[in-house]
Amino acid sequence: LTLPIGRAMCLGKVLRVGVKGLTGGHSGVEINKGRANANKVLAQTLRGLPLRLISIDGGSKDNAIPRASEAYLVSEDPKLPTMLKERWDAVRAALPTGETTVEFYCEEAQSDLLPMDWESSAYALELLNELPNGVQAMSADIEGLVQTSLNLGILETRADDVRMTFSVRSSVNAEKAALIETLRKLGARFGARYDESGEY
């Protein structure tokens, strides 16, 4: 999915905010172990807070569950670091029990890029939060076998868009097609383009 973004000047403090230390793993082999996806965790952390994204990036392979994700953002609200800490506590409590080494961080930073405009920033975070991820269906015939899943493996911000790359897997073609259609329709609601390459 490719989400076009606009950028606009904004006064405020630039911060670098991220999550690291998640377990990660291979999206085909370990998707059923309930491991947290850093891209989804960071988007959940930032949703609805008084900020505008500059960039949000995480992961380098579509078939690997990201262990870390990072955003540069700007905010005029001096209480944002406190709000982030409260949000981290809630997000940490909801993580799978095996995620014991996760770390959240927030520090002052600089960026050469203009922040996204309000709508682009809000759309990016809303879309990231609403996108499905992980196991979608288990096999009815073989106990413990994942039938259909997807993984948001790469999140990349460029000058004019945010690109979200998934690995979609299924042993049932109809389920895979339905899941891809869900991604396409959800992306279209926010003005994102869908394209695909490769097959699993």
Which role fits each region the language model picked out?
Residues 145-200:
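Substrate-recognition/cap regions that form aromatic- and gly/pro-loop-enriched pockets
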Residues 1-169:
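Midchain, well-structured core segments that form catalytic/ion-binding scaffolds
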